[in-house]
Amino acid sequence: MAESEAKQQPETVHGEEKRLKYLDFVQVAAIYVIVCFSSLYEYAKENSGPLKPGVQTVEGTVKTVIGPVYEKFYDVPFELLMFVDRKVEASIYELERHVPSLVKRASCQAITVAQKAPELALAVASEVQRPGVVDTAKNITKNVYSKCEPTAKELCSKYEPVAEQYAVSAWRSLNRLPLFPQVAQVVVPTAAYWSEKYNQSVSYTAERGYTVALYLPLIPTERIAKVFQDGSALPTVETNGNAIPLAQ
């Protein structure tokens, strides 16, 4: 009895070592694609008519040539996926060490909100049973907004300072990369232009009485500019060794 338990323990550990922790969905997707391709191939072969003997001959030749190679390397893709999975695990561990605890708590709250989705779905289902599609849509929108707005504002207030700090730091780092300043000269003004157009469109539709516009967030362009100015990290581009601030 003790010997059988001792044998089962190494097998269990070996099975856990062979199990993917983060990229198992890739393996499942690959198996699904292979099954679909095999089914499609079998269907095409069965309906190939007079070409079926030729297809079977080619299939036998391919199996003869590829078979030994497959037997030798069939486990390589999984081992490569396992290697990447372990790297992802190490990266997540390092990220958890460096991410501020404030962000972790906010992330937990976001997960809690996501877990409440089934309750909201039940409320929506019961609401749809009432007559009037337009009234139902309005009630659903108000219900979602009233339930999510407090949590969203709380998460935003916690994430904003951390996100602003990392944004300034990331801009400083990116601005040192070759060719990035030249790309920024094109991208930043374009992004600012379309952000302003978006804000104008949302404001216009809200003034015209469209309900959906009341729930669309505006892009805080002025706040973004102020963050970079306060951090002494106004987006700049380097030309001839001189850093020139980009126009707002």
Swiss-Prot record:
Looking up PANTHER family in the UniProt record yields: OS07G0671800 PROTEIN, REF/SRPP-LIKE PROTEIN OS05G0151300/LOC_OS05G05940
Output the superkingdom of the source species.
Eukaryota
Q: What induces it, per record?
A: By cold stress.
Q: What family is it from?
A: Belongs to the REF/SRPP family.
Q: For this UniProt record, give its keywords in alphabetical order, as a comma-separated list.
A: Stress response
One Pfam family in the UniProt entry: REF
InterPro entries named in the record:
REF
Instruction: Write the protein's name.
Output: Stress-related protein
